[in-house]
A protein has these predicted regions:
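Nucleic-acid endonuclease domains
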Residues: 1-161
């Protein structure tokens, strides 16, 4: 497929194109909200590839469950040339153990999967840092997590060609 020449489009045309793309992703069931599409895309990708059932938006502590009732918090982040941070979005009420595993996906700038891990709650709890001003924990999905006992590298399971 040929890429459109975005340089010739006005700012308004670019925003309209962006809106059309989001609407189509929602129509296809990839996006569930009109927020940053990386979060919805990550949830869709992980649930599809791992055979998980996505929960409704009312489940604050987890996003999906497997056939055995194991609860998964799913988070993704896109790495770019301007921002290579591996910090995932805030995790609230971490001590309450509302999920069994955090599945984190780091995407390359082109949205391909750079790496993905399934991380047990205990390891997230040990490695996350509490931030009082947001009343949440910050967790960095670093490649070095792969060496931690219990962390599963699921990159090949979720990578899209």
């Amino acid at each position: 497929m040929d890429k459109p020449d975005l340089a010739v489009l006005s700012e308004l045309e670019l925003l309209r194109l962006h809106g059309s793309v989001l609407a189509e992703l929602c129509r296809r069931g990839v996006c569930r909200t009109n927020n940053n599409p990386i979060a919805d895309y990550t949830e869709w990708l992980i649930s599809t590839r791992l055979g998980l059932r996505l929960e409704g938006g009312s489940k604050a502590a987890y996003d999906a469950v497997d056939q055995n009732g194991v609860r998964y918090q799913i988070k993704g982040r896109r790495l770019t040339a301007l921002n290579g941070s591996t910090q995932l979005s805030a995790i609230r009420n971490l001590e309450a153990a509302g999920f069994d595993f955090l599945v984190g996906v780091m995407f390359n700038d082109d949205y391909s999967v750079a790496y993905a891990f399934s991380v047990p709650h205990a390891i997230v709890l040990t490695n996350a840092k509490y931030q009082e001003h947001t009343n949440s924990h910050l967790f960095y999905l670093r490649r070095s997590l792969a060496s931690e006992s219990g962390v599963r590298d699921i990159t090949t399971l979720v990578a899209v060609c």
